């Protein structure tokens, strides 16, 4: 079996096509949940640990993105407490981390939460989903069902993320998150979840904006800070959400 750039493109394209073929209904349901929270004056919190943090960066504080989206991460705890002695892997697996993040970000009943975890097994993400469930806050999960269904939960409840969330978007990635065999090795390469996540994130953004337009409302969309007038445009939008610590 050959391996190279062309194989990466073919494998990733296959994942994206599978996403479009199987997950657009779930993307629509998730976008509706998020839109309804925004209509009620809430914001959408987006959590991902490790590489899953990239999903939130696709939706929060960037050109073409909606303003009332807030990135939530393990790094918030590290920044507050200082990096010395902080182990992000341990934080990701500790259910108590979820309660610290909920408090830090002052999550409100009208908000929504997107939780991104390829494996769907770790304590922080699953406890975050459970705590949102307890508070009546809608949870959208972005996860690999194939991986999650072949892995044991690390949460005390024994539950995995897809078993808790209100809406589940399957990123269609395989167990282990890699696509391409390496000749002569058991290891594989071609990590897929970040590429799939970027497509899902941009799809959600577009679906939410479409709902604003259909409702004859102006969507609060950022533009690039590196075009003329970008700072002024974005500053005016951020001021609308300053009480929720939204930044660009």
Predicted feature locations:
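Glycine-rich phosphate-binding loops that contact phosphosugars or nucleotide phosphates
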Residues: 39, 46-205
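Generic N-terminal amphipathic, Lys/Arg-enriched alpha-helix
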Residues: 1-22
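A ubiquitous structural signal for well-ordered alpha-helices
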Residues: 15, 30-33, 128
């Amino acid at each position: 079996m050959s391996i190279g750039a062309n194989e990466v493109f073919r494998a990733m394209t296959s994942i994206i096509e599978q996403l479009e073929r199987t997950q657009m209904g779930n993307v629509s349901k998730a976008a509706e949940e998020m839109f309804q929270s925004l209509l009620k004056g809430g914001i959408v919190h987006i959590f991902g640990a490790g590489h899953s943090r990239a999903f939130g960066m696709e939706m929060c504080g960037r050109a073409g993105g909606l303003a009332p989206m807030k990135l939530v991460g393990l790094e918030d705890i590290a920044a507050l407490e200082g990096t010395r002695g902080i182990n992000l892997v341990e934080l990701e697996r500790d259910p108590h981390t979820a309660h610290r993040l909920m408090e830090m970000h002052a999550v409100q009943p009208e908000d929504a939460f997107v939780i991104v975890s390829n494996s769907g097994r770790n304590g922080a993400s699953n406890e975050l989903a459970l705590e949102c469930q307890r508070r009546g806050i809608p949870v959208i999960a972005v996860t690999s069902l194939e991986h999650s269904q072949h892995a044991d939960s690390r949460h005390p409840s024994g539950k995995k993320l897809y078993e808790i969330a209100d809406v589940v978007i399957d990123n269609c990635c395989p167990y282990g998150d890699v696509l391409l065999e390496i000749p002569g090795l058991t290891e594989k390469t071609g990590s897929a979840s970040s590429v799939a996540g970027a497509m899902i994130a941009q799809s959600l953004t577009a679906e939410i904006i479409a709902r604003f337009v259909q409702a004859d409302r102006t969507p609060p969309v950022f533009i690039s800070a590196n075009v003329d007038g970008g700072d002024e445009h974005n500053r005016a939008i951020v001021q609308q959400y300053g009480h929720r610590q939204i930044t660009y």
